[in-house]
C-alpha cells in the first residue's frame, strides 16, 4: 500500500532530473501491517543521442505513400490533412536495460503522455509542393529537453512523398 510519494526536482544535476521517494507498507488478510519500506528512485536525464529518427517515406527508400491510399482513406490524416505520424513514423527512444539477458527497448516519443521527464516532442510539416505526380512534405520533429534553465534540442527531418503510381485507365465498352 502506497503511503506517501515525494518528488524532488534535481535542478542542474548532470545525471538525474528527479528523485522519487515512495513509502509503502504491506497488509495481510488478518490486517497485520509490515514496517514502512522506503524506495528511492533517481530518474536519469533524457539522452538525445538515443533518439532514433523516423525513416524517409520517399521514392528513394521505396517507402513513398500512394495517393490512392489517401484518396480511399486507408491512411489516417492529422488535423491539417497530412499523413498522420502514427502511420508515417515517430521518433523513438532507444534504451538499453543492463541485465541478463541484455534487453533493448524502444519507446515512442510522440504523443508525449506527460512532461515528467522534462521533454516535449512536437512536429511541423513544411509543404514542398507538387512536382509532377509527387507531393512532398518535410516533417520537422523537435525533441526538447529542459534542463538547468536551458534546453537541448534534437531535430529529425524525414521526407514524406505521396506518389501517383498508376496511369489512368480508360475502358471503352464499344468499338469506335
Segments the model singles out, each with a brief description of its role:
Residues 1-176:
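Proline-threonine-serine-rich low-complexity tracts
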Amino acid at each position: 500500500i502506497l503511503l506517501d510519494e515525494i518528488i524532488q526536482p534535481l535542478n542542474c544535476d548532470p545525471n538525474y532530473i528527479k528523485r522519487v521517494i515512495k513509502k509503502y507498507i504491506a497488509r495481510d488478510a488478518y490486517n497485520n501491517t509490515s514496517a514502512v519500506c522506503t524506495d528511492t528512485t533517481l530518474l536519469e536525464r533524457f539522452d538525445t543521442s538515443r533518439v532514433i529518427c523516423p525513416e524517409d517515406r520517399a521514392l528513394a527508400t521505396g517507402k513513398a505513400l500512394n495517393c490512392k491510399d489517401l484518396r480511399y482513406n486507408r491512411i489516417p490524416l492529422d488535423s491539417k490533412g497530412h499523413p498522420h505520424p502514427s502511420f508515417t513514423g515517430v521518433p523513438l527512444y532507444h534504451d538499453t536495460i543492463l541485465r541478463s539477458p541484455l534487453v533493448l527497448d524502444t519507446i515512442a516519443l510522440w504523443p508525449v503522455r506527460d512532461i515528467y521527464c522534462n521533454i516535449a516532442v512536437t512536429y511541423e510539416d513544411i509543404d514542398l509542393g507538387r512536382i509532377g505526380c509527387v507531393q512532398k512534405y518535410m516533417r520537422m520533429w523537435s525533441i526538447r529537453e529542459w534542463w538547468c534553465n536551458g534546453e537541448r534540442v534534437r531535430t529529425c527531418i524525414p521526407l514524406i512523398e505521396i506518389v501517383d503510381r498508376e496511369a489512368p485507365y480508360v475502358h471503352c465498352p464499344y468499338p469506335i
